[in-house]
A protein has these predicted regions:
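ABC ATPase nucleotide-binding domain helices that frame the ATP-binding cleft
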Residues: 38-41, 141-142
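The short alpha-helix immediately C-terminal to the Walker A/P-loop
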Residues: 42-43, 203
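ABC ATPase nucleotide-binding domains
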Residues: 77-79, 90-229
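ABC nucleotide-binding domain signature
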Residues: 28, 70-72, 76-86, 188
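C-terminal boundary and immediately downstream tail of ABC-type ATPase nucleotide-binding domains
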Residues: 223-246, 273
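A position-specific signal in ABC ATPase nucleotide-binding domains
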Residues: 48-49, 56, 102, 181
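Non-catalytic connector elements of ABC transporters
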Residues: 5-26, 30-32, 38-39, 46-49, ...
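ABC ATPase NBD Q-loop/coupling interface
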Residues: 54-76
Length: 349
């Protein structure tokens, strides 16, 4: 299965220009709140009409402004899980699931499909309960069951963990991960959480103010986000302004030091990104050594955060150090930190 999207939609403050393809796998749409991620899903589902463009699913045109094609949602074969799950409050779990089988006219077949989905989603004992009687995780499973029973060609999840308490997220995330891995089709996950995107999806699309900044395999996007905005959205703490010297070398502005990169330095490179965990203490003459002065140390349950500045205090970077135990002592403040050439990401913008 494959999805092709190339649409425009004018929104408050910017114009959404979503152009991407998604194959038979799980793909994350990563971006800040209000960047157009959820609107993109609504356009694919047929809930919102784009101003112009084209949406094609498995060779079947769902929307084409030039050809005046705009299939209604019920004809698109799209399953969309809303942030609040959108269960019908006056219907039981079983009745909600049956709503996903309106196209099936045989009563016996409808009952059998509903029973099978109740078993698959571990909802058999909750079939007669109403949404208000369910936990957040149970509500999500019921909403997913209602979607999946209709056998959609594409599954889209809009911030599926946003309505859950933090203690439930890990458990439910594991269930959603299994669902995405086993779904026989295209799956899109909207999130602003880079960790969720990394754990759950093999492919990633990074959006910012309605524009696709970067698309590709998730690990490749994290390793080479290509732009300052995409690096920040993937959680890079250190965006260090630089001046390119040659195709593999840059000078860090404010640090009086040069860095050698494994990736080629592109035209228009204005900064390098180095993730906070990728630094190690080193000697002054080590490759890619950066002179630093630690000015702040804070402790998390599983790591230490050190904020360092250049010797003259004109620039700043973050260093994260993993802890071997909860009682591990803080690391000694370094005089120099270095990063391997493979860990240094050239960035535009």
């Amino acid at each position: 299965m494959s999805l092709e999207v190339n649409i425009e939609k004018k929104l408050d403050g910017f114009t959404l220009r979503a152009a991407f393809t998604a194959g038979n796998t799980s793909t994350a749409l990563l971006g800040a709140s209000g960047c157009g991620k959820s609107m993109t899903l609504r356009c694919i589902a047929g809930i919102v009409k784009p101003d112009r463009g084209r949406i094609v699913l498995d060779g079947r045109v769902l929307f084409d402004s030039a050809q005046h094609i705009d299939l209604p949602p019920q004809q698109r074969g799209v399953g969309l899980l809303f942030q609040n799950y959108a269960l019908f409050p006056n219907m039981t779990v079983e009745q909600n699931i049956l709503c996903g089988l309106k196209a099936e006219k045989d009563p016996a077949a409808r009952r059998a499909a509903c029973a099978e989905m109740l078993r698959a989603m571990r909802l058999e004992t909750l079939a007669k309960r109403y949404p208000a009687q369910l936990s957040g995780g149970q509500q999500q499973r019921a909403a997913l069951a209602r979607i999946l029973v209709g056998k959609p060609r594409i599954l889209m999840l809009d911030e599926p963990f946003s309505a859950l308490d933090s203690y439930l997220r890990e458990e439910v995330e594991g269930e959603v991960g299994s669902l995405l891995a086993n779904f026989a089709g295209t799956a899109l996950l909207v999130t602003h959480n880079r960790d969720e995107a990394y754990r759950l999806c093999k492919e990633m699309i990074v959006l910012n103010e309605g524009q696709v900044l970067r698309a590709g395999k998730t690990k490749e996007v994290f390793a080479d986000p290509q732009s300052v905005a995409a690096a920040r959205l993937t959680g890079c703490k250190n965006i260090l302004p630089c001046t390119p010297l040659d195709s593999r070398t840059v000078r860090l502005d404010g640090w009086d030091t040069t860095l050698r990169l494994a990736l080629p330095v592109p035209a228009g490179c204005t900064a390098v990104g180095i993730r906070a965990h990728d630094f190690t203490p080193c000697a002054a003459d080590a490759p890619n050594a950066i002179p630093v002065k630690a000015v702040s140390t804070s402790e998390n349950p599983f790591d230490w955060n050190l904020i360092c500045t250049s010797p003259k205090g004109t620039a700043q970077l973050w260093w994260k150090v993993g802890k071997t135990s909860l009682s591990a002592a803080a690391p000694e403040p370094p005089q120099y930190l270095c990063a391997a050439p493979e860990s240094i990401m050239p960035l535009k913008g």
